[in-house]
Amino acid sequence: MGKKHKKHKAEWRSSYEDYADKPLEKPLKLVLKVGGSEVTELSGSGHDSSYYDDRSDHERERHKEKKKKKKKKSEKEKHLDDEERRKRKEEKKRKREREHCDTEGEADDFDPGKKVEVEPPPDRPVRACRTQPAENESTPIQQLLEHFLRQLQRKDPHGFFAFPVTDAIAPGYSMIIKHPMDFGTMKDKIVANEYKSVTEFKADFKLMCDNAMTYNRPDTVYYKLAKKILHAGFKMMSKQAALLGNEDTAVEEPVPEVVPVQVETAKKSKKPSREVISCMFEPEGNACSLTDSTAEEHVLALVEHAADEARDRINRFLPGGKMGYLKRNGDGSLLYSVVNTAEPDADEEETHPVDLSSLSSKLLPGFTTLGFKDERRNKVTFLSSATTALSMQNNSVFGDLKSDEMELLYSAYGDETGVQCALSLQEFVKDAGSYSKKVVDDLLDQITGGDHSRTLFQLKQRRNVPMKPPDEAKVGDTLGDSSSSVLEFMSMKSYPDVSVDISMLSSLGKVKKELDPDDSHLNLDETTKLLQDLHEAQAERGGSRPSSNLSSLSNASERDQHHLGSPSRLSVGEQPDVTHDPYEFLQSPEPAASAKT
């Protein structure tokens, strides 16, 4: 048999207290009577009652004494026992949890296909998935701009450009500088990812240096430092320095404090070490002095910056567009050089040949020449607009112009502007007199090459307005305007051998002398009749357009034969023949006269 373990003291005490708290009950007594005499007394428990009574009394007293002692201890250590019990319970719980985790871990180790997942403690933050980029992770352009900013801030050891400048530091700064900039603001913009390209970062850097050179005088430390930083910064951020891996653009590694200049770089610098050291430890007084080589590099950096800004502006306003200029090649061909190329860092310039194949479409099958066909949408009709129609109808020279009449005006004056100008000039001198009208007509004839007079004659012929042909009108005007017209007519009398019958010229001088007042009325009536006949003839001829086949037309009518067919036989003494139809001057000379000649 195994060894019997004793109960724990606390458990024994609790069981004893439970037993002591129970009230003691007296056993029942049984009295048996046999034949009227008492026999024996049996207790319900089967023990002696006297012995039980003595023992119960003794235990009761002992229990009372222990109870008194326990009350004293409980009053003193009651609060201590509660805390100890709580601590013990917590420690037991922790031990149980550890043992439970260890047992589960050992059981899971035997299962190779099952993954062990251990929950991290609640105070540690939950890690994000590595495949997803973190929110605070910087982009490549941000890393590049942060590197540039660190390099630029190292060139400002005193921190002049580290923070924004206020009016308390520099009086009147806000009145002079409208767009302030500093390294702190640039850093905030880098963190906020407001720079979309290096060009914008360079623009803010140049703005900061320009503000310092604008506010400060050239002999101040701030001006010299700003100019020095501007030159070094643009040189560092130039494309050539980035491609060659210059010492300023290479990422610097931490070096011992004893060495003032970094020696190890990603690539070897083209400059000797002495020149680099002299540049970095150059005194502030000589910061403004630039040699020819450094000045050229500075100008080159500024030109590259301006070119980058222009390229970005073009790409922003015309995305995908190609702007450039024409240049002639060595062999004489034309090339179109593109400025805003898709790859600005490309070594070769983007060019396109300019020839007929690039300007015209392909030759269609069956055609031997490249024809040009203008689209209907490109055709401009001047009469389609309401403004043109109103402006043409409201003129006082020609009212209610028709489409064919407008075509005549356009053929004479060229375009709408020319028509309006001609009509405006004629309307201006409408009531000014014949001399002003003649001056305007001569001016328009000189401009249009004589088309003005021919157009007016055709228009008035269509409207049945009597008017001399332009050639005859000019001849008549020149003869009427000359002061020596009578002498010229008289001088023609000395030429009897001419083919024209000039016998009527001898009677021109006698007309005014021999006319009586009574005969003047008769002459006026005849002149009126002749004018009416002329008007009817012009209306008859002007109403119909001449046909293209003039050779197949019939002979002249009887009326035309009456006016044009009969030769004039004027004598010196016949006065009434002067008032005949003026068309008689257009007839051909008689055959007899020609025979004489």
Curated annotation (Swiss-Prot):
PROSITE patterns hit by this protein: BROMODOMAIN_2
Annotated site residue numbers, Histone H4K5ac H4K8ac and histone H4K5bu H4K8bu binding: 169, 222
Region of interest (Disordered), residue spans: 1-25, 38-138, 536-597
GO biological process: chromatin remodeling; negative regulation of cell differentiation; positive regulation of cell population proliferation; positive regulation of stem cell population maintenance; regulation of transcription by RNA polymerase II
GO molecular function, one term: lysine-acetylated histone binding
Residues recorded with modification Phosphoserine: 56, 566, 588
Compositional bias (Basic residues): 1-10, 63-73, 86-97
Limits of the Bromo domain: 136-240
GO terms for cellular component: chromatin; GBAF complex; nucleoplasm; nucleus; SWI/SNF complex
Biased composition (Low complexity): 544-556
SUPFAM superfamilies: Bromodomain
InterPro entries with a match to the protein in the record: Bromodomain, Bromodomain-like_sf, Bromodomain_contain_prot, DUF3512
Transmembrane segments: none
Cross-link (Glycyl lysine isopeptide (Lys-Gly) (interchain with G-Cter in SUMO2)): 373
Subcellular location: Nucleus
Pfam families in UniProt: Bromodomain (PF00439), DUF3512 (PF12024)
Ranges of compositional bias, category Basic and acidic residues: 11-25, 50-62, 74-85, 111-126
Region spans: Histone H4K5ac H4K8ac and histone H4K5bu H4K8bu binding: 214-216
N6-acetyllysine: residues carrying this PTM: 373
Keyword entries, A-Z: Acetylation, Bromodomain, Chromatin regulator, Isopeptide bond, Nucleus, Phosphoprotein, Transcription, Transcription regulation, Ubl conjugation
Record remark on domains: The Bromo domain mediates interaction with histones that have acetylated lysine residues at specific positions. Also recognizes and binds histones that are butyrylated.
Function: Plays a role in chromatin remodeling and regulation of transcription. Acts as a chromatin reader that recognizes and binds acylated histones: binds histones that are acetylated and/or butyrylated. Component of SWI/SNF chromatin remodeling subcomplex GBAF that carries out key enzymatic activities, changing chromatin structure by altering DNA-histone contacts within a nucleosome in an ATP-dependent manner. Also orchestrates the RAD51-RAD54 complex formation and thereby plays a role in homologous recombination (HR).
Quaternary structure and partners: Binds acetylated histones H3 and H4. Binds butyrylated histone H4. Component of the multiprotein chromatin-remodeling subcomplex SWI/SNF called GBAF, which includes at least BICRA or BICRAL (mutually exclusive), BRD9, SS18, the core BAF subunits, SMARCA2/BRM, SMARCA4/BRG1/BAF190A, ACTL6A/BAF53, SMARCC1/BAF155, and SMARCD1/BAF60A. Interacts (via N-terminal bromodomain) with acetylated RAD54. Interacts (via C-terminus) with RAD51.
Protein name: Bromodomain-containing protein 9
Source species taxonomy: Eukaryota, Metazoa, Chordata, Craniata, Vertebrata
Gene that encodes the chain: BRD9
